[in-house]
């Protein structure tokens, strides 16, 4: 009996629409698919068509040695209409199965389906692909030790190269500013909230030219907190929060158009959340924007209570929140817009 085979281009197009979580189970089916799923062109196409998962990084109050490192999934279905505050965190998505998992503190960044994790002793970084289970441990060196006589601090920037498994120092670059928040990655570049003595701005690092560039900031108000996020892997979003005597307001800005490598940023005011006067204030750690439903999901830590984290769901003048279980000291719990991928490293 003869089997009819699809043309390779059509077969690749069909498979590129299958979620990576299912493709990883098919890679041992035949040699042709095994090679296809490792083709960078196919992986990029599959990543571009993948659906986004919202995950919440929090080790919770569980023992890491018993439960491994948990990444929680937040179910947003139904929130647009009912806005039910009982909708919260589902305790299931990925577990980090690594013999040294108990040394990992938590996720600090993410890009193209890969999660960057910090270790408790601050001597290594861990790159983790939750979809494939692949991990890589990267050694880092603390150049500056605790020294009371140290009065001059020289900042150097390094790039880690996966192919050579080595660090490379970037010479002759200095943004000459204060970086105020963790960065986000979008279309191969990194973006940070930064400031100098005169103003605040978005600081972009271009990995192609290996240079910093200053971009426009939406508002120069005296906000105490500013956090960046990414919208659909196309736009940047910025959260600003001020602590007034009468109320706490959260201002959400979104870039008007998709990010273009050669253009400055233009911002629009997306949403203003007024929490009113509250006795227990919180500081946003991360947030995600749903443009279509004009909604924001925000992870915050309660001020003066280090180990308590809450999640806010806010839209059109309505806010609800749900408290999350306590987290270990030093662990930063935040929301991640995660897309499963077959990226290899």
UniProtKB/Swiss-Prot annotation:
Domain F-box, chain residue ranges per copy: 1-46
Signal peptide: none
Pfam (any one): F-box
PROSITE patterns tied to this protein: FBOX
InterPro entries: F-box-assoc_dom_typ1, F-box-assoc_interact_dom, F-box-like_dom_sf, F-box_dom, SCF_F-box_component
Highest taxon of source: Eukaryota
Coiled coil ranges: none
Protein name in UniProt: Putative F-box protein At3g17265
